[in-house]
A protein has these predicted regions:
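Short, amphipathic C-terminal "tail helix"
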Residues: 165, 169-182
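Short flexible/disordered coil segments
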Residues: 16-17, 69-77, 177-182
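Conserved beta-loop-beta/alpha segment of the NTase-like Rossmann-fold superfamily
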Residues: 1-54, 79-82, 87-91
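Short, solvent-exposed polar/charged micro-motifs at secondary-structure junctions
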Residues: 45-49, 125-129, 162
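Catalytic-core segments of class I nucleotidyltransferases/pyrophosphorylases
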Residues: 4, 25-26, 57-157, 168-169
């Protein structure tokens, strides 16, 4: 089986995110290449950072560099063919003493088996790995919910809209939550 991995402290939001994910799965299945996503950030030192050659092709990915070569970070969403299992078993700890996902991505890059897609202005990526970034993400989600009057990522609504549960099941789930703001 192919593999999708998302870092637990990452939040993605934007119109078309579902189709982006479906397309990534199809791309990996068809090409047998890994797929990652790049995103422009103001503080690239916190992330795996993409560097480019003169033709704007990805040249390398460096984890949390002191001197970033670009402002494009690799977000915490990765799609891999099943070959990642074998590759991951061979990864050694980095200079920071950690097993880095960037090491895996660089192996795919070196073997010309890494596709990078850049998330545009219609998408938001939030890494909540620091107290400040967690607060920022909370405020962002709160602003969306208050302005639109809709909750973001209600799992019950999502599974109902996808046809995984019927109206009666949705109603039963909602009854348990009726006294909460959710």
């Amino acid at each position: 089986e192919d593999v999708c991995m998302i870092l637990g402290d990452n939040i993605f939001h934007g119109n078309g995110i579902n189709q982006l994910l479906v397309n990534a799965v199809k791309n990996v299945k068809k090409s047998k290449k890994a797929k990652v996503f790049g995103y422009y950030v103001n503080d690239p030192k916190r992330y795996g950072v993409l560097s480019f050659d003169d033709n704007k092709n990805v040249k390398s990915i460096e984890e949390k560099p002191l001197h970033p070569k670009s402002n494009y970070a690799v977000v915490g969403l990765y799609f891999y063919p099943n070959s990642v299992v074998k590759i991951a078993k061979g990864i050694l700890p980095s200079k920071r003493g950690e097993l880095e996902i960037t090491s895996i991505n660089n192996i795919y890059l070196k073997n010309n088996q890494l596709n990078v897609e850049f998330l545009g202005s219609g998408f938001t990526w939030l890494d909540t790995g620091t107290p400040d970034s967690l607060l920022e993400a909370s405020n962002f989600m709160q602003a969306i919910e208050k302005r639109q009057g809709l909750k973001v990522a209600c799992i019950e609504e999502i599974v109902f809209n996808k046809g995984y549960i019927n109206y009666k099941q949705l109603n039963n789930l909602a009854q348990n939550l009726s006294s909460s703001e959710y």
